[in-house]
């Protein structure tokens, strides 16, 4: 198991370092994140190598736990921070790095200092080292909880930006982040309990951790070299532009401008929405907030504000509602059309998503709706 784990982690590290396309490595967020993830998987490979070479698990739990914590903690730090880098487009402050690194430095200092000063040979069981390991495992939980809190905030911000920007649910773009965060957070709280065990619980934990890190690594690589990262960053940049616009408007302290903007939003969007609907633009594929705002001839910021205050809440709500109404009409008037043809005509990218949204709005499937009407 140790040899296979070491080889797998080595392959993952090499994949991140060597196999990334040039266009992806020029993207700041992925360029840094892949090196951090490669460092994390490399440390795990080194940990497996030391465990196998010196037989720590066979010598006793104390030595194995000490080795695990010394390598497992910085590995988790690097892997977790690499995901945070992707979430924030590389915008991680030195203070945030310093806090995480300081916690690890304290943990490593306690372990190494105890092993050197307690007077007990490392190959023998040591109560002092065991206590130091308990303290170190608690520090590990503190470090990972701190990072997870930052990841969660960044994930929620991305989720909001993407949900409001695209014409349909796009969790497929960054869903791996949420799964990686949740599974790694679960492993974090199991570490202080499982790491001191032997037998089946430790084996199950080790295998689970191995697969979680592998999944996160492969997902980060796939995401980094795909177009998905550009789509997420486009939505995020749009949201940041709107926020900056709001701050600038607030800084002007001009009630006249604010009033004019509000009147523009209320009057213009309502008057242009019907023209936009009549034009059939809502049936176009892959609409975004910026595209719709340009088609309607209104500022993107005010369109977003109007959507938030309306019954639709976001662009996907507006577009999906219009597309489903159109789909109902087409299903009745063109009974010879296939479901795929109806979905494509109404702007849905695939049949599965069309079925999902249609059932959500009507409570039935397209086929049953057509039979009953």
Label the model's feature ranges.
Residues 112-122, 153:
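Membrane-helix interface motif
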Residues 1-110, 125-128, 135:
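N-terminal low-complexity or simple alpha-helical regulatory segments
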Residues 57-63, 118-121, 185-202:
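Alpha-helical transmembrane segments and their membrane-interface junctions
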Residues 221-345, 352, 357-360, 364-373:
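Membrane-proximal linker segments that couple transmembrane helices to downstream signaling/catalytic modules
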Residues 86-97, 150, 208-236:
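Alpha-helical transmembrane segments and their immediate juxtamembrane interface regions
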Residues 16, 51, 108-115, 191, ...:
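Structural signal for membrane-spanning alpha-helices in multi-pass inner-membrane proteins
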Residues 69-78, 197-221:
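Hydrophobic alpha-helical transmembrane segments and immediately flanking/interface helices
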Residues 26-46, 100-102, 129-194, 207-215:
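Alpha-helical transmembrane segments of multi-pass integral membrane proteins
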